[in-house]
A protein has these predicted regions:
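Ampiphathic alpha-helical segments that act as solvent-exposed interaction surfaces
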Residues: 47-55, 82-119
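Polyanion-binding interface signature
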Residues: 1-81
Length: 119
């Protein structure tokens, strides 16, 4: 499957995949250096909470998520535990999770794109 939304046209606002030896994640990362803009986009997405939950299911959010390098971003994400990039038997589960959740994030973004971009 080709991901349609590789560029949101919003600087420092992106959809990301992540997997390690314990879990897989799909996230919206809001990485603006200007905290006012970062907060504004986070609040826009968060205002769609019930729609977001309908589309992607249970999710986590953190307005002040600290990356390993110390950078503070805002992140909304879903994760699947019990999978590992080092265990080929869990790869189908990881790919299925990525397809399902990224598709849901893309649909939400496209449906509410004008609202989200209106900052």
């Amino acid at each position: 499957r080709k991901w349609l939304l590789y560029d949101t046209k919003i600087k420092d606002f992106s959809f990301k995949f992540y997997a390690d030896n314990k879990k897989a994640e799909v996230s919206i990362d809001i990485e603006m250096k200007d905290e006012l803009f970062r907060n504004a986009y986070y609040e826009k997405i968060w205002s769609l909470e019930s729609i977001l939950e309908d589309e992607i299911g249970a999710f986590s959010k953190d307005e002040f998520y600290v990356l390993e390098n110390g950078k503070v971003i805002s992140r909304i994400w879903v994760e699947k535990n019990g999978v590992s990039i080092f265990n080929k038997q869990t790869w189908p589960d990881i790919f299925e999770f990525f397809v399902e959740k990224m598709d849901a994030f893309e649909r939400l973004f496209y449906e509410y794109e004008d609202f989200i971009k209106d900052i």
